[in-house]
Regions:
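Protein kinase-like catalytic core scaffold
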Residues: 37, 72, 86, 142-144
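Conserved hydrophobic core/spine positions of the Hanks-type protein kinase catalytic domain
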Residues: 115-119
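Hydrophobic residue at the +6 position relative to the catalytic HRD Asp in the kinase catalytic loop
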Residues: 129-134
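Conserved structural core of kinase catalytic domains
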Residues: 71-110
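Juxta-kinase regulatory segment immediately upstream of eukaryotic protein kinase catalytic domains
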Residues: 1-16
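C-lobe/activation-segment region of protein kinase-like
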Residues: 121-126, 137-176
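The N-lobe alphaC helix and its flanking beta3-alphaC-beta4 segment of protein kinase-like domains
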Residues: 51-69
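ATP-binding glycine-rich loop module of kinase domains
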Residues: 15-57
């Protein structure tokens, strides 16, 4: 990161750390001195397996769609079109991926994702079911990405997401 201060709509945020990189951007944990947030900086790096148009508008549109469906997600704070940045609520805690690798699965997580699917599939949608995109907090599993895509059975939770979750839990068993 060439700088440790990023702005969204003229407000400065200090970068605390990189949270992760996805196909659409880099997510940073930032603070304004009062609270912590996630700031996503859209990137334009090539992705062999996915084609995205206007990534910022796509994320904002997907956020509205998923919110309307009642998917538990972090609140959208602000978006800055010129700098292609999104500021959203920070859901503290480890991701499902981290917890699976630590040998701390919760069977309620699968049921919560399946409940999300009962809303998503009839709307013709999938989300990115990769376990790094979910954070449990106070009994609720949050989908911390804003991405959704057209439903395709090979990429739904039962055919893609659940096997990935199971494989990550198995990695823990093999490493132990």
């Amino acid at each position: 990161m060439p700088c440790d201060i990023l702005t969204v709509n003229d407000t400065k945020y200090t970068v605390l750390r990189l949270l992760g990189k996805g196909k659409g951007g880099y997510s940073y944990l930032v603070t304004d001195g009062r609270a912590q947030y996630v700031l996503k900086q859209i990137h334009h790096e090539p992705c062999d397996y996915y084609t995205l148009g206007d990534k910022l508008q796509s994320e904002l549109r997907d956020y509205k769609t998923l919110r309307t469906l009642g998917i538990p997600m972090p609140e959208l704070g602000y978006a800055s079109s010129p700098k292609e940045r999104i500021l959203k609520e920070y859901i503290p805690g480890p991701t499902v991926a981290e917890l699976l690798k630590a040998g701390q699965p919760d069977p309620g997580w699968v049921a919560q994702v399946q409940a999300m699917c009962t809303r998503l599939y009839p709307a013709g949608l999938n989300i990115d079911y990769y376990p790094t995109n979910f954070v449990p907090r106070d009994g609720t599993l949050y989908y911390i990405d804003y991405e959704c895509s057209a439903y395709m059975e090979p990429w739904d939770f039962e055919h893609w997401g659940l096997p990935v979750w199971t494989a990550q839990a198995a990695e823990r068993t093999e490493d132990a």
